[in-house]
């Protein structure tokens, strides 16, 4: 039998990105958390954590985290059927990974009523849409929104739709860098904005225009900051259509190539044995996502 106090300590260290915060969340001393991790490692006969900053799970650690995540979800179902088992009486909580652009645009509208109706608290982890699935694979989250269709073992994926991005820049930037009009081959020689090192959307966009290779760019790991820097004329960027309607209407931003958007598919990944609440949320997102996302057409 598993000792779930030990597994909870492992989950807390990963979810809170360190021993100190894990101790605060569990109401224990940092040394007590460390002792539980050591005891767990002694019982499984191998390390469950890589001692880096932040700590990372080993292969067996990931398997244990997957187990903990699914047990938590099943326990929630049982507590809803037998309320007396819920000794703490706390609201439900789901840990979900999603990309910053979804969080900045459609996510709140899609889940707001659901969370209120089901007294659900969310623990959101922001990851680029191309790498969010690693959180599922590590057993750190109950579900994720990402651009990959293929689910991890033990999970399912559901196509929600696609986020449409358009290449935008300020009027001043366009006048300064494209006085004769915008041509695709000029884009690599003008400063761009990229969300982070895992963001390859600009590379895909340029490739779709027949332009390959390196390009000048700023890194800006903030969805809101990305828009502000684009408005300020620091570079051109691919921004969600949902996020810049007001800027377009006010003339703060202009589209570089109006007939050349790029769509990014968004899939909802969730554990196959995730329990009733996660199943209800999945059905809810399947019904509502089309209000914000465009249909995805495979290239």
Curated annotation (Swiss-Prot):
Belongs to the LysR transcriptional regulatory family. This is HTH-type transcriptional regulator ArgP. Keywords: DNA-binding, Transcription, Transcription regulation. Controls the transcription of genes involved in arginine and lysine metabolism. Homodimer. It holds the Pfam family LysR_substrate. The lineage of its organism: Bacteria, Pseudomonadati, Pseudomonadota, Gammaproteobacteria, Pseudomonadales. It comes from Pseudomonas fluorescens (strain ATCC BAA-477 / NRRL B-23932 / Pf-5). Residues 2-58 form the HTH lysR-type domain. Residues 19-38 bind DNA. It comes from the Bacteria. InterPro entries: ArgP, ArgP_gammaproteobact, LTTR, LysR_subst-bd, Tscrpt_reg_HTH_LysR, WH-like_DNA-bd_sf, WH_DNA-bd_sf. GO terms for molecular function: DNA binding; DNA-binding transcription factor activity.
């Amino acid at each position: 039998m598993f000792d779930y106090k030990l597994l909870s300590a492992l989950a807390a260290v990963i979810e809170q990105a360190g021993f100190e915060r894990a101790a605060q969340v569990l109401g224990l001393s940092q040394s007590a958390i460390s002792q539980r991790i050591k005891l767990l490692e002694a019982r499984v006969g191998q390390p469950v954590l890589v001692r880096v900053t932040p700590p990372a799970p080993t292969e067996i650690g990931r398997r244990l985290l997957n187990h903990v995540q699914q047990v938590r979800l099943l326990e929630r179902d049982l507590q809803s059927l037998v309320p007396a088992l819920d000794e703490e009486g706390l609201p439900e909580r789901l840990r979900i990974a999603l990309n910053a652009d979804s969080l900045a645009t459609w996510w709140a509208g899609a889940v707001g009523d659901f969370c209120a109706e089901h007294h659900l608290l969310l623990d959101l982890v922001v990851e680029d849409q191309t790498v969010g699935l690693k959180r599922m694979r590590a057993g750190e989250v109950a579900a994720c929104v990402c651009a990959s269709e293929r689910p991890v073992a033990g999970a399912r994926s559901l196509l929600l739709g696609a986020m449409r991005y358009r290449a935008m820049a300020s009027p001043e930037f366009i006048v300064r860098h494209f006085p004769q009009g915008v041509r695709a081959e000029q884009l690599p020689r003008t400063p761009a904005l990229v969300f982070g090192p895992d963001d390859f959307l600009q590379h895909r966009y340029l490739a779709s225009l027949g332009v390959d290779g390196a390009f000048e760019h700023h890194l800006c790991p903030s969805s809101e900051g990305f828009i502000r820097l684009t408005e300020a004329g620091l570079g051109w960027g691919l921004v969600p259509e949902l996020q810049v309607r007001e800027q377009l209407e006010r003339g703060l931003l202009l589209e570089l190539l109006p007939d050349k958007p790029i769509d990014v598919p968004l899939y909802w990944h969730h554990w196959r044995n995730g329990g009733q609440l996660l199943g209800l949320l999945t059905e809810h997102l399947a019904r509502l996502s089309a209000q914000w996302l465009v249909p995805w057409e495979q290239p």
